[in-house]
UniProtKB/Swiss-Prot annotation:
It is found in: Lysosome membrane. It comes from the Eukaryota. The lineage of its organism: Eukaryota, Metazoa, Chordata, Craniata, Vertebrata. It comes from Homo sapiens. GO terms for cellular component: azurophil granule membrane; nucleus; perinuclear region of cytoplasm; plasma membrane. This is Membrane protein BRI3. Belongs to the BRI3 family. GO terms for molecular function: identical protein binding. Participates in tumor necrosis factor-alpha (TNF)-induced cell death. May be a target of Wnt/beta-catenin signaling in the liver. It is a multi-pass membrane protein. The chain crosses the membrane at residues 67-86, 92-112.
Length: 125
């Protein structure tokens, strides 16, 4: 292996004189962003001791709502066995009032219907 130094000479020093511009960025001052003005001085206390201690109150309130795990809810499904689908059935009284009070009896018939599960036989009003 050859142990020669990679650079024979030292690189030239970086000296950018005023008035000399880098031609890659354009002439000096053209399109340059002016320097920001210095920030204003900070006000100092004369005594050096703070006159009061500010009180800081941190009040945090967070409402956490927990939802049950995702489950499939069947519309019209039986809440007892969770297998059957509820069917509507009319009561005897509802059918009787529908016949006796013919035009208005249908309101009674639909108001007095029951829901029944064909799987487990549970009835709901």
């Amino acid at each position: 292996m050859d142990h020669k130094p990679l650079l024979q000479e030292r690189p030239p020093a970086y000296n950018l004189e005023a008035g000399q511009g880098d031609y890659a960025c354009g002439p000096h001052g053209y399109g340059a962003i002016p320097a920001a003005p210095p920030p204003p001085p900070y006000p100092y206390l004369v005594t050096g001791i703070p006159t009061h201690h500010p009180r800081v109150y941190n009040i945090h309130s967070r409402t956490v709502t927990r939802y049950p795990a995702n489950s499939i809810v069947v519309v019209g499904g039986c809440p007892v066995c969770r297998v059957g689908v509820l069917e509507d059935c009319f009561t005897f009284l509802g059918i009787f009032l529908a016949i006796i009070l013919f035009p208005f009896g249908f309101i009674c018939c639909f108001a007095l219907r029951k829901r029944r599960c064909p799987n487990c036989g549970a009835t709901f009003a």
